[in-house]
Structure formats: structure tokens, C-alpha cells
Amino acid sequence: GLQMIEATSCGGVVIFRGKLLVLYKNYRNKYEGWVLPKGTVEPGEDFKQTALREVHEETGVAASIIKYIGKSQYTFNTPQDTIEKTVHWYLMMADSYYSKPQREEYFVDSGYYKFYEAYHLLKFSNEKQILEKAYNEYLDLKKANLWGNRKYF
């Protein structure tokens, strides 16, 4: 029968000047669409390190972590196994609008979008939920004049 395999990934919702970073992935014709940057935890890494590394590897962006947002969980099947995936998400701040999608990771486009645009672009509903949660955290920090004040964090 199918084996159940647990997998852990980490990713980031990256914001610069109120806009959110999303990536267009075209994965070997298996699926394509707009996604948030994320990837698998490597041996010896903590979740924050994974999230920062994956954001940098997939987008070229060097971001800073502001806070933990939460996790999304979902299951998918491969011919051999059932994969139970947990993704830990961090709210991050970039220092410019620069991004460069990494083609070797199947990313063909990237950019910073206003919240409602990014929300509608995203392919997966669990990523839409995380985007909304992260954006609301950002708005709260901004309202309290804490966004961009790195000393506070």
C-alpha cells in the first residue's frame, strides 16, 4: 500500500513598501502558476534559515525575517506514497523591489504586487490564506509604526 511520508518546508511572504513578492512557476508541464517562495528543510538548518535560503535561492532576494506567520498543511499523492506536507511561513521585509526568478528552479517570472493583485494571482488557496494573514500582520505593525524599525525586532 501507499506509505505516508511527512515532509517539512519553510517559506516567506516578502514585503517591500506594501507590495508582496510572488513567483511564476512552470514545473515541467506538471503545473504552472503563481506561488510563494518555499522549500525543503536541509539537515542542520532551523526553519528560519530554510525560509531565508529558499527565498534567496528562488527569487534572488535577500530579505530579513520579521515574524512567524503560521503553517499550512496539505497532502498529495505520488505513485508510490502519500506525502503529508507542513509548510512554516515567515513574514519578511525586502530592501528593494529587486527580484530575479531562478530558471533552474523552474521560475520564469517574479514581481512585487499590491495585496489584492497578489491574492488573485496565487494558485493555491492555502497560500492565499497565508498571504492574507501575513499582510494583516504587516498592516498592524505599520499602524503601530513598527514596520521597518529593525531595532524593534
Segments predicted by a language model, with ranges:
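Unchanged
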Residues: 41-129
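Residue-level detector of alpha-helical recognition elements and their boundaries
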Residues: 27, 66, 70, 105, ...
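Charged phosphate-binding loop/patch that engages nucleotide di/tri-phosphates or the phosphate backbone
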Residues: 123-153
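Short, low-complexity, intrinsically disordered N-terminal peptides in bacterial proteins
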Residues: 1-4, 152
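A generic structural signal for ordered secondary structure
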Residues: 11, 19-21, 47-48, 68, ...
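N-terminal strand-loop-strand
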Residues: 3-36
